[in-house]
Amino acid sequence: MRIAWLAFLCLFSLFTVSGPEVTGTPQSQPQILIGSIQVTGQKRFSSDHIVAASGLRIGQPFQLDALNDAVNRLGDTGAFEFARYNFHPQAGKVVVELVVQETAKFHKCVFDNFVWFSDKELQERLRREVPLFDGWAPEAGNMADAIGGELQKLLREKGISASVTHTVYGALGDKNWIYLFDADGAKEQVVAVNFEGAATVDVVTLQKEAVPLLKRNYALTEFRIFARTTFIPFYRERGYLQVKLGDPTPKPAKAEQCLTDCDVAVTFPVAEGLIYQWSPAVWNGDLIATVSDLEKIMGMKQGEVANGKKIDSGFDSVRKEYWRKGFIDVQIKPNTTFDDTAKTVTYAVAISQGPQYHMGELQLLGMSPALTGKLKTLWRCKTGDIYDGNYLEEFTRQEFGKALRETQTRATKIETRPAINKESKIVDVLIEVK
């Protein structure tokens, strides 16, 4: 700040007029005003938004304390790695320059259950009242709190009795987590689920898939997951391999305004796309079977509806065929080509089988001698044999239960752990009873 203070003294001298001593009532020194505010260094935000967030205004008195407060205010948002200022005189006023460097870490803001407002309304309100809001908030700083505070203010204006909270939402270790904002304390029971754009599918059957959503409190994040795990597979099973569902749109189900407790109607926008038929796959790479045999394993026939669920199961069966022959690192990469004119889909499948693994040692822990002996007798994958990657699951599901019954053993928990040695290409298997 020493440099800034010296600059201020020099600046002050420019506005001070020297002259002969005057007796009588002293006149006050005229105020120095900010004539313009410039911003440099920014990429994400506009100059106007940064100036608004700083709290500075053109025409206000020039004061160092105000400049210090402005850069501190910018820093507190968390949106900047640093913020500083320069200034110089121009035409009897002061030009202020805010020099910033924006942070790289921002996270998307998601509004989970504000059913009283459209997403557009929320976005417009926050962009107007929180100067740096652009749908995202920095990882550090107070901007997320400012967003929550503005949402709380909006609820109060509408007479809605709910408390706004925000949490970090995402899978453990996921760097792309989101800020999730909730209106806690609001009862928002879903009474209807609609599909906008569902024109060719059997809507009655689709509605049955949506029944689990009824009588639940609305939450965008939960409904997104449900759509991805239920509605998308529903369409793919019927050949709609390029179906797309947008985010659900909630709104009060009744015409009159609701406050805290609302019956909610939810609409999913759907772009169904075409119903595709299967065209024989093109197989490339490390093939351990003939193309004809691979097609049989897939279980698909030319001209039949390209059932996405059946196709996924077919590729899983092909993978298991490689596992059965010891290729447990196999990589199967299907690439789709859609012919919208013929309404067909062709998969070009590249296979890299990787190394072949062999069986190492079988370890049995926590068992009686009788059970240990029985399992060793039943286990057919011997040391040195090609390791069957499917066998451990099959053995646990079938032979293990048989051995428990024959030895009259009760097991509350069974753990299986294959130990894969990438260097020796050996797999040791441990089975433990707890």
Describe the predicted segments one by one.
Residues M1-A4:
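Positively charged n-region of N-terminal signal peptides that target proteins for export
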Residues L6-T16:
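Bacterial N-terminal signal peptides
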Residues F15-Q27:
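Signal peptide processing junction and immediate N-terminal pro/mature segment
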Residues G24-K434:
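Interaction-mediating elements
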